[in-house]
């Protein structure tokens, strides 16, 4: 619940992405990773000594990072200061201290959050000696490492874990209610939707738990539904951070998404389903959260240009392969379909915690498998004789087979589709595992 967020900052080409990839690989060796996409280089989860945390590579979001203006780096660091619990500042021992390093260090010296100065490419005794120069940045002790070989990353991770702030567990009463987070790119209408939904200015309400650094649960009762609204937007918003890149909206969404049960993704009907929307949707899916998509400002769209059905179909193509998601057309301004939106969100919450008895699951799925068995591989037939839902927080299903290695992704998608055909898992990611019987 109280997952820590780590931001890796620094100028281009100092090894931020290599360090990020090394941290994420540690996690993938422990758990089954969600099928990756190219955006995995920006955000991932890691674990060290039993503590889980999320890692964001700020450099991964900068296009044309060979020629990034100093102002862009400054904005990234300011946002990391706002959003992260711990900041790793990566520098390059080969190049020594550069003017841009000094600019970043000047910003970081002003913050009270933990900052770990990580000197990269230190792989011999001479470079250990050269690294002493980085004391001049005024950030205290530093940690030397070599991101390519992995040397020194263990000490860096030990220091990282020690730097995590102590976070109180939320009150039990807050835990029992569904947690909904309203997410989306800037100016899509998130604030208008929240204010229309709760019928009051959200800054007036009383917080149940949390600090300005944490996602805050605020309890509401609307249309007969009790829920907690996970709110991070507005608490740390600063006008000086111009949110015009994918990085900003995604970074601002991370904590709310990780803290929520269901994410309400608000998109601007006048702009369509853009790259930032896709990234936030992917972030929710990767975290195995429920998702509802609200197409806001639908009242502003010329209806003769595109029908809601065409618009919805276009969005679903962008969501593939996870297309079983409720899409509603709303207007926060006129309060059109707000009740429907909340009802859909509550239903997704119920879908996410749905449990199917093993007997019923086998009765249906074994018939499905018998009608269309897995393709034979190398003259060998795959036989699945037993299946069940795992006792996990999110829907996960395991199928026991004699040759699990021969069951490929297309057949796993077929199994998922058949599960969705028979049970309502709309808005909820499903995991399918094939294990040896």
From Swiss-Prot:
The keyword NAD does not apply. Belongs to the TRAFAC class TrmE-Era-EngA-EngB-Septin-like GTPase superfamily. EngA (Der) GTPase family. One of its GO terms (biological process) is ribosome biogenesis. The lineage of its organism: Bacteria, Pseudomonadati, Bacteroidota, Flavobacteriia, Flavobacteriales. Keywords: GTP-binding, Nucleotide-binding, Repeat, Ribosome biogenesis. This is GTPase Der. It holds the Pfam family MMR_HSR1. Residues 354-437 form the KH-like domain. The gene is der. GTPase that plays an essential role in the late steps of ribosome biogenesis. One of its GO terms (molecular function) is GTP binding.
């Amino acid at each position: 619940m109280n997952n820590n967020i780590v931001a890796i900052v620094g100028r281009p080409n100092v090894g931020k992405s290599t360090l990020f990839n090394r941290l994420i690989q540690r996690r993938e060796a422990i758990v089954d990773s969600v099928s990756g996409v190219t955006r995995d280089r920006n955000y991932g989860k890691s674990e060290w000594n039993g503590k889980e945390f999320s890692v964001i590579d700020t450099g991964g979001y900068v296009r044309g990072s060979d020629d990034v203006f100093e102002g862009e780096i400054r904005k990234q660091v300011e946002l990391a200061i706002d959003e992260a619990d711990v900041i790793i500042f990566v520098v390059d021992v080969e190049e020594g201290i550069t003017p841009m390093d000094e600019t970043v260090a000047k910003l970081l010296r002003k913050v009270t959050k933990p900052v770990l100065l990580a000197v990269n490419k230190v792989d011999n005794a001479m470079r250990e000696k050269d690294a002493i120069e980085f004391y001049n940045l005024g950030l205290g002790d530093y940690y030397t490492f070599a991101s390519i070989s992995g040397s020194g990353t263990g000490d860096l991770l030990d220091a990282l874990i020690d730097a995590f702030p102590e976070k109180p567990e939320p009150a039990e009463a807050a835990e029992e209610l569904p947690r909904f987070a309203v997410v989306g790119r800037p100016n899509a209408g998130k604030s208008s939707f929240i204010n229309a939904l709760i019928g009051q200015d959200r800054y007036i309400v009383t917080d149940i738990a949390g600090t300005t650094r944490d996602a805050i649960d605020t309890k509401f009762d609307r249309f007969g539904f009790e829920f907690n609204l996970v709110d991070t937007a507005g608490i740390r918003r600063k006008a000086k951070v111009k949110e015009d890149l994918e990085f900003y909206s995604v970074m601002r969404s991370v904590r709310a998404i990780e803290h929520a049960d269901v994410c309400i993704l608000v998109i601007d009907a006048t702009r369509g389903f853009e790259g930032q929307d896709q990234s936030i949707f992917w972030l929710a899916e990767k975290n195995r959260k429920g998702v509802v998509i609200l197409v806001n400002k639908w009242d502003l769209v010329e209806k003769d240009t595109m029908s809601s059905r065409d618009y919805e179909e276009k969005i679903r193509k962008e969501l593939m392969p996870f297309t079983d998601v409720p899409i509603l057309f709303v207007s926060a301004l006129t309060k059109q379909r707000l009740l429907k939106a909340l009802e859909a969100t509550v239903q997704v919450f119920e879908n996410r915690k749905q449990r199917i008895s093993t007997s019923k699951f086998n009765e249906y799925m074994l018939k499905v498998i018998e009608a269309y068995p897995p393709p034979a591989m190398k003259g060998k037939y795959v036989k699945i004789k037993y299946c069940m839902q795992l006792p996990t927080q999110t829907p996960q299903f395991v199928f026991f087979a004699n040759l699990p290695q021969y069951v490929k992704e297309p057949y796993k998608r077929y199994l998922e589709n058949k599960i969705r055909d028979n049970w309502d898992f709309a808005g909820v990611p499903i995991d399918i595992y094939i294990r040896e019987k």
